[in-house]
Curated annotation (Swiss-Prot):
Pfam families: B3_4 (PF03483), B5 (PF03484), FDX-ACB (PF03147), tRNA_bind (PF01588), tRNA_synthFbeta (PF17759)
Species: Corynebacterium jeikeium (strain K411)
The protein's name in its UniProt record: Phenylalanine--tRNA ligase beta subunit
Cofactor-binding details, from the entry: Binds 2 magnesium ions per tetramer.
Keyword Cell membrane recorded: no
Any one GO BP annotation for this protein: phenylalanyl-tRNA aminoacylation
Broad EC category: ligase
tRNA-binding domain: residues covered: 44-159
Statement: the UniProt record of this protein carries the keyword GTP-binding: no
Amino acid sequence: MLISQSWLTRILQTSNPQWSVSAEEFDAGFVRVGFETEGYEAIPETTGPLVIGRVEKIEELTEFKKPIRYCDVNVGQANGTGELQHIICGARNFAEGDNVVIALPGTVLPGPFEISARKTYGKISEGMICSAMEVGLASQQNPGIMTISDADLASANLKVGDDARELLGLQDTIFDVNITPDRGYALSARGLARELASSFDLQFRDPAQDPAAAAMRNDLFAGLPGTDGEVQALKVDEDTKCSKFGMRKVTGIDPQAESPLWLQRELMLCGQRPVNPATDVTNYVMFLLGQPMHAFDADKVTGELHVRLAKKGEKLTTLDDVERTLDPEDVVISDESGIQSLAGVMGGSTSEISEATTNVLFEAAHWDQITVARTCRRHKLSSEASRRFERGTDAAIIEDALDFAVALLVNIAGGQVEEGRTLVGAVPEMPMITIHTSLPGKTAGKIYPDGTTISRLREVGCEVRETGSRDDNGAREIEVTPPTWRPDLTMPADLVEEVLRLEGLEDIPSIVPTAPAGRGYTPRQRMRRNVGQALAWAGYAEILPTPFIANDVFDVWDLPADDPRRLTVKVQNPLESDYACIGTTLLPSMIESLRRNVTRGQRDAALYGVEQVSVPKSAKPFSPMPSVKQRPGAEELQELLDSLPAQPLHVAVVATGNRQLQGTWGEPEAFTAADAIESARVVARAAGVEITVRNAEYLPWHPGRCAEILVGDKVVGHAGELHPQVCERAELPPRTVAMEMNLDALPLEETFPRPVLSAFPAVLQDIAVVVDEATPAQDVEDALRAGAGELLEEIRLFDVYHSESLGEGKRSLTFSLRFRAPDRTLTEEEASKSREAALQFATEKVGAQLRA
């Protein structure tokens, strides 16, 4: 929030007349009570003759592409001669007789921009008529020149030719205070002044009830008519969650009136552009008290105002001239002619204040925080009002805000306040929180003086009552009721934070506890680490799969309707509506990542990811969220636990293109289904388990090039080549391969005894066998392994050969066999006997014949 140091200082000086600090101390004061400032900046200095002038004559120059005015301006004796200054200006919002700010030759405006007499548009221009931005009061260009009323000059005891700096308040500093979402009360001068009073140990008078405390006229509220009776018929529907709604009315204002300079200045320094007195008053009250308001042109409101939920398809053109289609969850204010406002966010254009408005209806309300936040998100629309309603406002000051608004408007634009006030609803009841006074000290590890907790909570604005009870250490029990402007205080921890914040977070001792002895990784963590390292060493690049998958991905895969992978967890408020499901498999995310790599030119890619998936236990919807006001009961907790999905840890691999690139070492080698199966073996070795593979049909894999991975008799994953249609629909090259395994299904303890490491040499032999084309290579390998006996240490398939000479429907499989004895040097004869035994057993089991 942007706010000037002078505004906050004036509020605090009403109770502390002599108080004043530097900008650096001001900044430190914010930090001391837990508020960060994005920065602070003094209004840029203007040097030289910056004076008040009066426009005496305007000559319109029409021979140029845009309208130009040649003005005669009276600057008194400021120019040393008393003669009129002749100044060229392109702005159109001032007239003869208006008081303006003049930068005479020799003035250096912020920029720096030096003013000198020079010829332009065929005339000599002897200075500049300034806008608010040009003198440093506004950060954005305001439409036109800044004019000063005679009343502003009289109140400051100034005349034409006098220096304008003091009137403009150019000796000031602007602070940009970072307000966290839980502290909506601080989005106001009232809230920040209260915090600074605590920081500097000052007295504080609440400006909500006392105009003098807001550094305004003591008699501002004097003469306000009574509030008996209604000024506007009103109906508030209960389902809108509007707890309080109030209105007051002003009639007969001067439609040509302008806001005084002091009001325009405060708004500009808060980053708000002055518009007209009625709108400026609502913005000023919002920045002063933190209560957003809206001003209706009362003559454009017909019949009863109705606070209700929008109907589907209703439309509203908001003040930013955008037509919006409303949602049934949006809260609106309507009358007999239609919708007039999007509640808590922005008013409608049909009843906005115009240059002809003479009767104004002010509205102030207390809207539901969540409803306003969802409306803003839904319409991608944010405003100063919605920022405050989203964070929570003070329902207790609605009447005060209305009184401020009507009194200020009458003071500025004339007219009279209509007797009566429409008020529906009441201030929501604040929760009572019970704590012991020792809790802040226990939390901080610091002993605070007796009474600190009570005094600090009262300083925040809480009502504190001692119950008379004490804990075992003698600490008093107190019942605390937070103030209405602090809806964020709901539990003991919130009260502890307030005490520690005001006592000084920097005073809490920084004592590092003794770290317990490390126990290392758990077996599951060790498995995950080993698997990741093994795949990385095998040449795969790690990615972090997103848990969200496209709603239609399983339709793209043509999965059967009864496939259990279709039963997914649905997210109620997804980041993207097309990705509202939490995956039961990692492959959709892996395939999408591979697609992005391929489309960006990475044709040869091998990726792996290790992440949890979510597998619902049933199609039953989740239990509703429990209340946060109390701990859930045992039955409610069990129901919640039963409804949570299982979240097994999966590992997945996808690869496409060439496994080995072309080079001096040889021709390129493409990824095949065998590489996907080998990645499963890499995972198994890293996890310390033994797997087997066999043919399978399992989408999204190719039905003839898919293997299921087993540990014992349990299927733990699949690997192979993706289905051609899946590749085409996913925009992947043909013959892309993939593997996915359930790591949680792998046993933590090895299912086979660790082999004894032998120091004796191994004997390597190869064997080539001819088998039927339909015989799985795994079956042949298993038969050879079983027949070779205990001397066989490793068997590996390294060649598959097809030829007409082998016979129709035949193929050759060549295996490398490694034999080793644990207690002696193995001879070639012994190894050959084991090889012959392996061949004989394979012949009996799978019909394998030794290849000639």
